């Protein structure tokens, strides 16, 4: 249920400088169709911003032990050598398919997040791109918790490409791997920024605003009230939500379009996803707090948004 919605379609606000331009993008893959679906988006970002793409595959002890069935150490070492050779070959094909995009490939062994965090720190990674599925977890990017670790602890923004994102077709990079996906182009025409209006909003909202400015995109700011049983008697939270959303956009933001302010009542994930679908949004922006492992929105909400969104979801540390 939409409680309040303010929108103006005139594109006459003056544009000013202010850009987001990641220099180093990390794309994590386990070579499943789930993770491979994010590669076209990582490549599109690199083409747009002139970024270097860091392609990472981690051979985890857990996955290798499952493959060996608990056999002796010699067999484990042979399997590891074979797995590393296979992974190196796949990464070489990915690299060759990236054409003129500057790229580096990594095969690591051990705990996934430990290896990723090291690569992130050593290479000043500005953005992480992952593919996810919508069942019980965040994809086969290793056995259950890896994508969650990334979203909770990444020191930089994370772009998640969920199972309902359009354009998950075939791409030349993966010819011969059974999952060829076609290129996509980075075109942001409408961005939806969802917030629960905590203090973190003041550090995350500028990212959505900067992207809207840079791409001359429409921007919708949405706040969802999940506990709305008393709103007819005391509508204060609605009015407060509108004022706080409006305050997130500086008066001198100089966007191409006047931002749309929306306050809705209902399940947060449903309202956010439906708002993005209604506007044919190209990106949803959410906040995350890596320091204490909690999300700006509840993690279950973030998960459901990623699982059901028809566009990529950008989570930003706050």
Feature-to-residue mapping (PLM):
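Glycine-rich, Arg-bearing micro-motifs that act as flexible, cationic patches
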Residues: 127-153, 164-168, 283-308, 318
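Small/aliphatic-rich secondary-structure junction motif
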Residues: 6, 10-74, 181-235, 308
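Short, hinge-like loop/turn segments at secondary-structure boundaries
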Residues: 70-74, 122, 147, 175-184, ...
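Structural beta-alpha unit
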Residues: 1-21, 34, 41, 93-128, ...
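Extended, non-globular alpha-helical segments
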Residues: 2-17, 151-181, 236-237
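General small-molecule cofactor/ligand-binding pocket signal
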Residues: 54-56, 104-108, 159, 220-222, ...
């Amino acid at each position: 249920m939409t409680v309040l919605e303010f929108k103006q379609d005139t594109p006459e606000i003056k544009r000013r400088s202010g850009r987001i331009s990641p220099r180093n993008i990390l794309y994590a893959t386990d070579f499943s169709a789930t993770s491979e679906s994010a590669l076209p988006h990582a490549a599109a970002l690199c083409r747009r911003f002139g970024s270097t793409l860091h392609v990472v595959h981690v051979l985890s002890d857990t996955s290798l032990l499952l493959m060996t069935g608990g056999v002796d150490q010699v067999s484990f070492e042979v399997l590891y050598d074979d797995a590393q050779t296979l992974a190196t070959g796949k990464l070489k094909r990915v690299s060759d398919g990236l054409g003129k995009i500057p790229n580096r490939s990594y095969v690591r062994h051990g705990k996934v997040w430990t290896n990723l965090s090291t690569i992130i720190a050593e290479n000043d990674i500005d953005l992480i791109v992952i593919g996810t599925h919508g069942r019980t977890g965040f994809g086969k990017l290793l056995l259950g918790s890896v994508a969650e670790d990334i979203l909770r602890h990444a020191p930089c923004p994370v772009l998640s490409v969920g199972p309902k994102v359009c354009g998950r077709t075939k791409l030349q990079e993966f010819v011969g791997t059974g999952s060829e996906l076609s290129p996509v182009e980075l075109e942001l025409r409408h961005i939806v920024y969802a917030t629960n209006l905590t203090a973190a909003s003041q550090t995350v909202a500028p990212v959505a605003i900067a992207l809207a400015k840079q791409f001359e995109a429409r921007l919708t700011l949405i706040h969802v009230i999940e506990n709305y049983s008393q709103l007819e008697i005391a509508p204060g939270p609605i009015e407060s939500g509108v004022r706080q959303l409006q305050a997130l956009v500086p008066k001198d933001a100089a966007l191409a379009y006047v931002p749309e302010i929306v306050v809705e009542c209902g399940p947060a994930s449903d309202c956010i996803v439906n708002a993005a679908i209604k506007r044919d949004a190209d990106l949803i922006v959410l906040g995350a707090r890596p320091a204490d492992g909690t999300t700006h929105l509840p993690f279950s909400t973030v998960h459901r948004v990623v699982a059901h969104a028809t566009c990529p979801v950008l989570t930003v540390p706050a």
